[in-house]
Amino acid sequence: MSEYTLENIAQVVEILREKSPLTHCITNVVTVKDCANAVLAVGASPIMANAPEEAEEIVGISNSLVINIGTLTKEQIETMKKSAKFAIENNKPFILDPVGVGISNIRNQTPIDIITNSKPSIIRGNLSEIKAIAMMYDILDECTMAKGVDVAQCDIINKDTLISNCNLIKNISEKLNTTIAVSGPIDIISDGHDVYTIENGDAMMSRITGSGCMLGCVLGAYLAVTNPLEAAITGTLVMGIAGELAAKTARDNNKGTGSFGIYLIDELSKLNKSTILSQSKLNKM
Amino acid sequence: MSEYTLENIAQVVEILREKSPLTHCITNVVTVKDCANAVLAVGASPIMANAPEEAEEIVGISNSLVINIGTLTKEQIETMKKSAKFAIENNKPFILDPVGVGISNIRNQTPIDIITNSKPSIIRGNLSEIKAIAMMYDILDECTMAKGVDVAQCDIINKDTLISNCNLIKNISEKLNTTIAVSGPIDIISDGHDVYTIENGDAMMSRITGSGCMLGCVLGAYLAVTNPLEAAITGTLVMGIAGELAAKTARDNNKGTGSFGIYLIDELSKLNKSTILSQSKLNKM
Amino acid sequence: MSEYTLENIAQVVEILREKSPLTHCITNVVTVKDCANAVLAVGASPIMANAPEEAEEIVGISNSLVINIGTLTKEQIETMKKSAKFAIENNKPFILDPVGVGISNIRNQTPIDIITNSKPSIIRGNLSEIKAIAMMYDILDECTMAKGVDVAQCDIINKDTLISNCNLIKNISEKLNTTIAVSGPIDIISDGHDVYTIENGDAMMSRITGSGCMLGCVLGAYLAVTNPLEAAITGTLVMGIAGELAAKTARDNNKGTGSFGIYLIDELSKLNKSTILSQSKLNKM
């Protein structure tokens, strides 16, 4: 229940660059390269492996694990379950990114299996995804169906819905006994006790594929060097600030979404202590 | 058999940005991220899913479907067949991009199965691919083998071969009872009645991977908001114009093919009504 | 045992652009698009296919083959074995890139099977990977475990360890009867008789994913037009020079690793005879 200052966060950013932990990402085929480059850009060392035959060996040498269900296959689901189980048995922290949960049966069953059998350190997603998870655990009675892998229109967090959503996320986090990181125009992070909001970021982030997936992998990298709540705050700030700076560069140079995606990795790779201290819009509720 | 004006096309471009339909792409692992970013750039919302277990659920929530056979696996072939069948039964338009048809048995059998059992709204490809399809349906007696996934040298459409190729494409389109979109230095599009040609584009587009795949997915996005012929014309114009503008920027700044690929997404994301009206080189034959 | 001059190398660079051979890459899902774009950038024509059902057909039409084990699946392992066997039976040169060998059982068994049953023309990797291969063939008694898919700290080649590592690589190459290309701050290439070192490149190359994978595919492209030793020297010089120029552009413009990755493809696509002659840092030991 400690309070995290920007000084703490800036330190975590630097520690990751010093320690360069091995971050294992079992993720989708759409954005896997951007995920690897994002992990490298913030200073960690990524590995991506999908075969169930090597699941335990790879988790065994890794410092943390990311599970992103964006493009599941039967084989990958097996790898995810084995990896999550092995991670929890060996005290390796891991994050679950339940992309598109709520829109198909395997996108519901895979997260349920992983959450129930191998409690993740962090679950991250957009509000529609987190609500879909909450509904499956009877924490919520109803939720709006997401638009594919994107958030439902009514689940976009704004000033008016912030307080109620903060309470909701705190409640879900407490019930599931895990840290929850929700991304949106305003990000909400809770460990069931405290709630933080972050107002960094830019709307351009939702005009490219991979912003959410990269965030999940960056959180996974920070999980290797600090506790889940601080990892979630740090990674969300880092991605939000990088997104903001990248969008500014894209607009200033009359570029579109292609260049924005490249500038985002640029900013992640250049980001340091002073960027965190000067740019962060972090609030404790 | 209506005639499409640039005003019509420009309207379709704007309608896609307003409606942002969900475009489901079952596509190859090489260019899948560029496909998602291209769909986002023109204003639609992409989803990529490969598991047969969720095929019907994902098609069920999507507004249109793209099937690209670039890197087939046994599992993905099953997903494609189920998805195409479900799409046709539920009146969801879909486009088939038979990448490399003619070079292997599974690249022949998969399109045949899909075309025969679940008529696509559009089939798009380079001339070698479309001729390979035509030969399998006894519309053509012979064709030149493509160079891998690239067009055969003798199948590059130019001024001299334009008329005969237009007649050929119209004939194939009529026989297969579907819209055909052939890309090349001059693009040819026919619904079996009318034939349109487009002279936008740049040779640099064939020096990166994914130009054809992105085109297929962009056509798929427009399929969600208009009829196959207009969708094919609109998407082909949009990609061609974006390619032209991106190549100019790359050359003006002494950049190579890496930057060109990024500028292409930039231009897709910036393209609007006035770009269409001022840049289009569309002819009705 | 001939000596390769920069004139020879520059000629190979030009011949690849003229002949544009079909280069088949069975590679990982992380960097597959960059691999295709790198192959296109140096002038060859890439094809990527993973299904065992079409393995022999695709190798049959290809001029050379690349096998990269970065993200193995059961199906892909089958494709690799069939493809390697068919390549060797049909005198198609191929290169093996044993990504992460030493860190899991399938990453050990797959290269062993391929090396033993279908001798590759080139094996390329970082020093940790090549040492792991050597240990499995009893050429070395011990080696340091790599850090995931990255080189172990103690295996980074520098001035002090250069001579001993050159001798080691020459020995491994002789014993395995294949050309070995080791990448690092100083690259070492040997065919068991001669040893060449290359000091081009930039540290930024290890801050993005895919530098090694792209190198493997570029070597594969050159394998289609010359012998393994000259192909390895040419491809390593080409990638190193492109990396150096790209890093300079990134630094001069205060860009990060995202832009660097794009500039790398730019430089590969612009590289010509005069770049080779003016920039190469090639030494025969």
Swiss-Prot record, chains A, B, C:
InterPro entries: Hyethyz_kinase, Ribokinase-like
Binding annotation for substrate: 48, 210
Catalytic reaction list: 5-(2-hydroxyethyl)-4-methylthiazole + ATP = 4-methyl-5-(2-phosphooxyethyl)-thiazole + ADP + H(+)
HAMAP family: Thz_kinase
rRNA-binding listed as a keyword: no
Entry keyword set: ATP-binding, Kinase, Magnesium, Metal-binding, Nucleotide-binding, Thiamine biosynthesis, Transferase
One of the protein's GO biological processes: thiamine biosynthetic process
Primary role: Catalyzes the phosphorylation of the hydroxyl group of 4-methyl-5-beta-hydroxyethylthiazole (THZ).
Binding site residues for ATP: 124, 183
Gene of this entry: thiM1
Cofactor entry: Mg(2+)
Pfam families attached to this UniProt entry: HK
EC number per UniProt: 2.7.1.50
Single GO MF annotation: hydroxyethylthiazole kinase activity
CDD domains documented for this protein: THZ_kinase
Family to which the UniProt record says this protein belongs: Belongs to the Thz kinase family.
UniProt pathway: Cofactor biosynthesis; thiamine diphosphate biosynthesis; 4-methyl-5-(2-phosphoethyl)-thiazole from 5-(2-hydroxyethyl)-4-methylthiazole: step 1/1
Annotated protein name in UniProt: Hydroxyethylthiazole kinase 1
